[in-house]
Every structure is written in C-alpha cells, then in structure tokens.
Amino acid sequence: MITYTKPLSKLIGHFEKFPGIGPRTAQRLALFVLKQPESTIRDFSKALLEAHSNVGRCKKCFNFTSEDECEICKNTERNQKLICVVAETKDLLALERAREFKGVYHVIGGLISPMDSVGPELLEIRSLVERVSKSEIDEIILALTPSVEGDTTSLYIGKLLAPFTKVTRIAYGLPMGSELEYVDEVTLARALEGRTKLN
C-alpha cells in the first residue's frame, strides 16, 4: 500500500469523490495539481468558488444558470410547448449536442430509486406537474436513462401528466443501463425522432 504525505493524501481523497474518478486517476490529478504554478492554482480555486457561489438553478426548468432563467428557457425561438424531461443537466447537454431538439427542458435532478432512498418527493417532479398544468403544453418527451430506475421514473411521470398532455418517451438504440451522456449525437437524434407514446 502506497503511503502519501498527509496533504497529498487529502487532495487525492477529494478528487476520488468526483464521479467517474478512481484512485489512480485521483492520484494523477493530484500530482498534476502539485506541478502547477501557485497562480494557476489560485485562479482554479477562485473559479471553483465563483461557480459554486454564482451558479444556481433556473426557476423554470432547474438547469444550471447564473440568472433567474437559463438561456434555453429565455430563448424565444425555442418551442415552449414542447418539454423534454431529463434526469440531470449532463443529459440536457448531451441532447443539445445532437442539435435535434428545438423545445425546452425540465431537469428533475435524478431518478426514482427506492434502493437509494430516492423517492419522487426528492425530485423536481411536482414542479413539472405544476408547470404542465398551468401552461398549454403540446407534448412531454421523457428522455431518461434506459434502466430500471429510468423506467420506473418514466412510468410515474407518465401517469401524472397523462391528464394534461401527450407524453412520449425517446426510442433507444443502446443497451439497457446505458448513460444518456455517453450516447453519440446521431443515435440521440434518431432516438428523438423515433419516440413512442406513453399515454
């Protein structure tokens, strides 16, 4: 077992908390940081603190923004009557890269997962229902990960929104359990085109 000096060990431990970062990658990142000039580290620290202090959630869709509403919600050229529901902002970004979707989004902040003690009350589902019930929405597209949790969440939301509008789910050309974030743009574009009706 490798023994690090305490400050380095602490830094590696912090990097390991990042999603997708294992012990070896955390070690590489920590060693990279130590090689940087102090001015670079100060700038990086400042950028982290500024982002954490100044970036919040859009009051409409819960995407990240530094204003009350995000750029997508404020864009009058987007179809405000077409809402795509995603679990996380990273999924929204993946769909934006595909350049196929012209509507707006609603970020629910995760998936229903009883095993992880995540119920619907911990997600932005109630705000979605309120948003749909108070507006004229033509269609809700559910773009949630093809997994047990994704299916559960889609069915739950589909039942809640069925009285208000048409609810569809994007088609998938990828295996069960795949993360939306890692799907290529062409597959995502086809998934949007081939969406199926839920209600």
UniProtKB/Swiss-Prot annotation:
UniProt KW Cell division keyword: no
Stretches of the chain forming a coiled coil according to its record: none
Name the species this protein comes from. Prochlorococcus marinus (strain MIT 9312)
Q: Where is the Toprim domain?
A: 81-175
Reply yes or no: does the keyword Disulfide bond apply. no
Query: Sorted alphabetically, which InterPro entries does this protein's record hold?
Result: DNA_Rcmb_RecR, Rcmb_RecR, Rcmb_RecR_Znf, TOPRIM_dom, TOPRIM_RecR
What are the UniProt keywords, alphabetically? DNA damage, DNA recombination, DNA repair, Metal-binding, Zinc, Zinc-finger
* Domain of life from the UniProt record: Bacteria
Q: Tell me the function of this protein.
A: May play a role in DNA repair. It seems to be involved in an RecBC-independent recombinational process of DNA repair. It may act with RecF and RecO.
Output this protein's name: Recombination protein RecR
Task: Give one GO molecular function term.
Answer: zinc ion binding
List residue spans of C4-type Zn fingers.
58-73
Q: Which SMART domains match?
A: TOPRIM (SM00493)
Single Gene Ontology BP term?
DNA repair
What PROSITE patterns does the database record attribute to this sequence?
A: RECR, TOPRIM
Similarity annotation: Belongs to the RecR family.
